[in-house]
């Protein structure tokens, strides 16, 4: 879990877009390996995609 102070700091809008924090939008708040399109970290993305809870996403098979 992310610290409460970091979550509050993340809500402030930065002067430049690249200075913003990317944290997992799910409950974990992980700061690394965040997919911006889905606002999820790779771990949460994998769990939700395997359960079929993200529309249009499925596991690749070839």
UniProtKB/Swiss-Prot annotation:
<keyword id="KW-0687">Ribonucleoprotein</keyword>
<dbReference type="InterPro" id="IPR001209">
    <property type="entry name" value="Ribosomal_uS14"/>
</dbReference>
<dbReference type="InterPro" id="IPR043140">
    <property type="entry name" value="Ribosomal_uS14_sf"/>
</dbReference>
<feature type="binding site">
    <location>
        <position position="41"/>
    </location>
    <ligand>
        <name>Zn(2+)</name>
    </ligand>
</feature>
<dbReference type="InterPro" id="IPR023053">
    <property type="entry name" value="Ribosomal_uS14_bact"/>
</dbReference>
<feature type="binding site">
    <location>
        <position position="44"/>
    </location>
    <ligand>
        <name>Zn(2+)</name>
    </ligand>
</feature>
<dbReference type="GO" id="GO:0003735">
    <property type="term" value="F:structural constituent of ribosome"/>
</dbReference>
<keyword id="KW-0699">rRNA-binding</keyword>
<dbReference type="GO" id="GO:0006412">
    <property type="term" value="P:translation"/>
</dbReference>
<dbReference type="GO" id="GO:0005840">
    <property type="term" value="C:ribosome"/>
</dbReference>
<keyword id="KW-0479">Metal-binding</keyword>
<keyword id="KW-0694">RNA-binding</keyword>
<dbReference type="Pfam" id="PF00253">
    <property type="entry name" value="Ribosomal_S14"/>
</dbReference>
<comment type="similarity">
    <text>Belongs to the universal ribosomal protein uS14 family. Zinc-binding uS14 subfamily.</text>
</comment>
<keyword id="KW-0862">Zinc</keyword>
<protein>
    <recommendedName>
        <fullName>Small ribosomal subunit protein uS14</fullName>
    </recommendedName>
</protein>
<feature type="binding site">
    <location>
        <position position="28"/>
    </location>
    <ligand>
        <name>Zn(2+)</name>
    </ligand>
</feature>
<feature type="binding site">
    <location>
        <position position="24"/>
    </location>
    <ligand>
        <name>Zn(2+)</name>
    </ligand>
</feature>
<dbReference type="GO" id="GO:1990904">
    <property type="term" value="C:ribonucleoprotein complex"/>
</dbReference>
<dbReference type="GO" id="GO:0046872">
    <property type="term" value="F:metal ion binding"/>
</dbReference>
<comment type="function">
    <text>Binds 16S rRNA, required for the assembly of 30S particles and may also be responsible for determining the conformation of the 16S rRNA at the A site.</text>
</comment>
<keyword id="KW-0689">Ribosomal protein</keyword>
<dbReference type="GO" id="GO:0019843">
    <property type="term" value="F:rRNA binding"/>
</dbReference>
<comment type="subunit">
    <text>Part of the 30S ribosomal subunit. Contacts proteins S3 and S10.</text>
</comment>
């Amino acid at each position: 879990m992310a610290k409460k102070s970091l979550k509050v700091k993340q809500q402030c809008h930065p002067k430049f877009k690249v200075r913003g924090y990317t944290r997992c939008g799910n409950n974990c708040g992980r700061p690394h390996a965040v997919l911006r399109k889905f606002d999820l970290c790779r771990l949460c993305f994998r769990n939700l995609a395997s359960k079929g809870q993200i529309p249009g996403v499925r596991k690749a098979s070839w």
